[in-house]
Amino acid sequence: MERKVGTVSRGIRCPIIREGDNLPEIVVNSVLEAAASEGFSLRDRDVISVTESIVARSQGNYATIEDIAADVKAKLGGGTIGVIFPILSRNRFAICLKGIAKGAKKIVLMLSYPSDEVGNALITWDQVDEAGINPYSDVLTLEKYRELFGENKHEFTGVDYVQYYADLIKEAGAEVEVIFANQAKTILQYTDCVLNCDIHTRARTNRILLAAGAKVVCSLDDILNAPVNGSGCNERYGLLGSNKSTEDKIKLFPRECQGMVEEIQASILEKTGKHVEVMVYGDGAFKDPQGKIWELADPVVSPAFTSGLIGTPNELKLKYLADNDFKNLSGAALKDAISAAIKAKQGSLVGNMASQGTTPRQLTDLIGSLCDLTSGSGDKGTPVVLVQGYFDNFTD
């Protein structure tokens, strides 16, 4: 019978993961048990994806706000620190801010507006337009912001992040001054010691600040990039990708997980004879059209993956072929012609009109986004996702 199903994404239920658990063994067993339970078989080039959360949990990669405070104080001097361009998130940044504030006498908190880097809005563009201000040049004090815009709560969380962040800083024992600006060098009017908290634009922000005369500049990836008092760390990403664990502890982005994905790949090959690909994934890279939020608070979608996931898709657009190259064909003749075109396609279709609209993005970004949507971030209990048929085409 002709095959009728293409790509399938399955959430795989797993035990609750604790520090020290043998995660590769748990992942392999969970996938094989799911296959036996649901009556499907593994195939070559299936993708087994493991959420970064359980990787970090199994590694015990945690740190406290006191660890953050100690590192911030050591690297930024413990006086007045400019904290600029943080994202607006209780889970992602608020607990980090507690630790940062504990490591300083005063925090000058500079928020971008009308939204943060990933799209969480303080105010709307309509409000900016109505107020007649220029977000590219105008610097607002807290008083001016309140005068123009009043209290604005986040559409989904109901939190006034301006007040929330200011209160966190005060509770941590530091003075706080809040300003609103979109030019990094504005902060140098207040302090020359700066912690820039943006994620994907951090290298440019660092460069701008140093060129403008900043004395000390750190990014979040410079904080906890080595253990502090025996804490966890991430040598490459520091605090980037961290999440709230408890009221005084964070879970850091997983470290050194390349060996784990390769171990899972080897174990599946040994047990089934199938050569699968394996990746660790965090946030997907999709954008919410309602809230305008780009769902990528992690520094990367995938911090580790097997070699078969390097690159981008190399696909032809079926509707382009049907409407152009083979517009006079139909039925079996059309199917045969398209199948022949797929089998004859070049190794790289960059610049080929027949590939337009085929999503030329990194495979790990595409598959990681699919997996993030499949596993969810709540109580599904499926921190492993099996994707089958992703690399198949119309002829398979």
Language model segments and positions:
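Conserved mixed alpha/beta catalytic, RNA-binding, or beta-rich assembly cores of soluble enzyme
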Residues: 1-44, 53-396
